[in-house]
Every structure is written in C-alpha cells, then in structure tokens.
Amino acid sequence: MQLTSFTDYGLRALIYMASLPDGRMTSISEVTEVYDVSRNHMVKIINQLSRAGFVTAVRGKNGGIRLGKPANTICIGDVVRELEPLSLVNCSSEFCHITPACRLKQALSKAVQSFLKELDNYTLADLVEENQPLYKLLLVE
C-alpha cells in the first residue's frame, strides 16, 4: 500500500509544525517551500487538517498555522484515516463477475486495519521529539 501524496504531504506538514519551537506559527508558504510542493495542493491539505482539528489557522497580520492540539495527542493512524481513501479495491463495479464470491475485499480490509492499528501506536511527538537530524534537515534548530 502506498499513501497518496495528499496524505504524505499532510503528514510532512504536521511533522514540520511539530518540529517548531513551542508557540511558533508558520505559514502555508513556508511549509510548501520546505518541501517544494504546490501551494494550491498544500492549501487543500491544510484545510482538511484544520477541519479535522489537527491544525489551527489564525487569520490576520500575526496569523499563520500551527498544530491544533499537542503533538503527543495526534495519533498517526487518525491522521491517515482522515486524509487517505482506504478502499483498496472497487467492488461496486458491474464489470467484476466474481464479486458475489470474492474474498479479496475482506482480506484487504483486514490488512488495512492491521496497518492502521500499527500506526495507532505512534503519535506525532514520537516522530519528532529529540530528533536532532530532523531539526537540522528542516532548519528549525
């Protein structure tokens, strides 16, 4: 299973925000510059993360974006569930003749649940706390 770029960059944006010193806000432009991604794409990602409560956006002259809650309460599995379409096969297709007897969807569903259960063991803080090599790469020391 490969995550979509939407989920990948959503996780990267959260990692960047979690790596910043406490209280420091950033901007979508700054995040897109760090990861060299499309600003339009990142706006959509940040909007969805904001709707889900993972990010808070503050308007105005001193505004910006920051984590919506502490990094140690943001579960990676929850972020992936929010951003990633997790249906691996389309069993509603009228062209699939084995749908009535197929067990593939159930097997794939169990695999996805195992994947998410493992990600549930990690918080955003687990990925960034005391990770000096990461801080150096992101230039946030």
UniProtKB/Swiss-Prot annotation:
Molecular function per GO: 2 iron, 2 sulfur cluster binding; DNA-binding transcription factor activity; double-stranded DNA binding; iron ion binding
Domain HTH rrf2-type: 2-129
Any single GO CC term annotated in Swiss-Prot or TrEMBL for this entry: cytosol
Cofactor entry: [2Fe-2S] cluster
TM regions (residue ranges): none
Gene3D superfamilies registered for this protein in UniProt: Winged helix-like DNA-binding domain superfamily/Winged helix DNA-binding domain (1.10.10.10)
GO biological process: negative regulation of DNA-templated transcription
Sequence positions that bind [2Fe-2S] cluster: C91, C96, C102
Keyword Nucleotide-binding included in the entry's annotation: no
Cofactor note: Binds 1 [2Fe-2S] cluster per subunit.
DNA-binding region, residue range(s): 28-51
The UniProt record lists the keyword Transcription regulation: yes
Coiled coil residues, start to end: none
One Pfam entry name: Rrf2
Protein function: Nitric oxide-sensitive repressor of genes involved in protecting the cell against nitrosative stress. May require iron for activity.
Protein name as it appears in the record: HTH-type transcriptional repressor NsrR
Organism from which the protein derives: Salmonella typhi
